[in-house]
From Swiss-Prot:
Keyword Lyase recorded: no
Protein's name in the database: GTPase Obg
GO BP annotations listed: ribosome biogenesis
Binding residues annotated for Mg(2+), in chain numbering: 173, 193
PANTHER family (UniProt xref): DEVELOPMENTALLY REGULATED GTP-BINDING PROTEIN-RELATED (PTHR11702), MITOCHONDRIAL RIBOSOME-ASSOCIATED GTPASE 2 (PTHR11702:SF31)
């Protein structure tokens, strides 16, 4: 399944049906009177969170959505049928923005949640509505009201309990594949991961959802590399696991590079709880490992965990540290179905 986390969509609710001008024409009824029915109401445009979705890819191929128009009224006091609503299905974690891409309209956080984005127009009154003691045979009726139309942006922020961050090639995808059933692409070159990945992790009988996003590089907040556009997917996480490559030139500088990008992004990431771990400890000599650990400790101002995603050493300890922060009620119950959905491809 292709991954798409942003889409521009045009929506229009249905116009109301027109009211009808009609009169009763029945035998033996000399003054039948008005009998024009009202028009039906136009259909609404509704956004609904669907279980099992984790991408907005459907909106790459169709961008225009229109609800049905209400039917016109008819004689014999027959009201027009209401137009059918149109329902757009989105993944949990989707946000709706106005066309300016800045004004937040709604934020979806629960499966089954619905939001009426555009209401259909009211149907017009038929001439029977205007009958009064002074106007026994009105010959006027109202047209239906037009529906609402607008362009909107759908933006997906995946919901996970914990998020993996780090420079490209820090071993995040290897870690995710080691602790979950997720099968991200793994290779020994930067930017192997091009899209966020989700995995369901079971640690000591506790399940939670872990998100892996493409690696950050210096200047990502200015658009360098893949930029910081994927950071929104870990903005909702309760805790970040920051992996630093022990084989890099300077672990402290590597940590600060990513930390600078997180702070530049701002939002909820600046004060997010962070667990720091030195990865690939199996690939360096003991003396070099001690130097890298000390460098990272000084930069992060905390003692880093030591692990090797490749061999599994230290991985359980890292998972237990995540579980301790996530607490007793992880959001994985909401996000698990999305994490277990069909994986994305590049």
């Amino acid at each position: 399944m292709k991954f798409l986390d942003e889409a521009k969509v045009y929506i229009r609710s249905g116009d109301g049906g027109n009211g009808c001008v009609a009169f009763r024409r029945e035998k033996f009824i000399e003054f039948g009177g008005p009998s024009g029915g009202n028009g039906g109401r136009g259909g609404n445009v509704i956004i609904e969170v669907a279980d099992g979705l984790n991408t907005l890819i459907d909106y790459r191929y169709q961008q225009h959505f229109k609800a049905q128009k209400g039917e016109n009224g008819a004689g014999s006091d027959r009201h027009g049928a209401n137009g059918k609503n149109i329902v757009l299905k989105v993944p949990m974690g989707t946000q709706i923005f106005d066309e300016d891409r800045e004004t937040l309209i709604h934020d979806f956080t629960n499966v089954g949640e619905k939001f009426v984005l555009a209401e259909g127009g009211n149907g017009g009154f038929g001439n029977a509505h205007f009958k009064s003691s002074t106007n026994r045979a009105p010959r006027n009726a109202n047209p239906g009201q037009p529906g609402e139309e607008r362009w909107i942006w759908l933006r997906l922020k995946l919901i996970a309990d914990a998020g993996l961050v780090g420079l490209p090639n820090a071993g995040k995808s290897t870690f995710l594949s080691k602790v979950s059933a997720a099968k991200p692409k793994i290779a020994d070159y930067p930017f192997t991961t091009l899209h966020p990945q989700l995995g369901v992790v079971n640690a000591d009988g506790r399940e939670f959802v872990l998100a892996d996003i493409p690696g950050l590089i210096e200047g990502a907040h200015e658009g360098a590399g893949l930029g910081d556009r994927f950071l929104g997917h870990v903005e909702r996480c309760r805790v970040l696991l920051h992996l630093v490559d022990a084989t890099c030139e300077h672990a402290g500088k590597a940590y600060k590079t990513v930390r600078t990008e997180l702070d530049a992004y701002g939002g909820l990431l600046t004060d997010k709880i962070e667990i720091v771990a030195l990865n690939k400890i199996d690939a360096v000599e003991p003396d070099e490992l001690k130097k890298q650990k000390d460098r990272l400790k000084r930069a992060a101002k905390k003692t880093p965990l030591l692990l090797s995603a490749a061999t599994g050493e230290g991985v359980k300890e890292a998972l237990r540290a995540l579980v301790a922060v996530i607490g007793e009620a992880p959001v994985s119950a909401k996000a698990k179905s999305a994490a277990e959905a069909e994986p994305w491809s590049a």
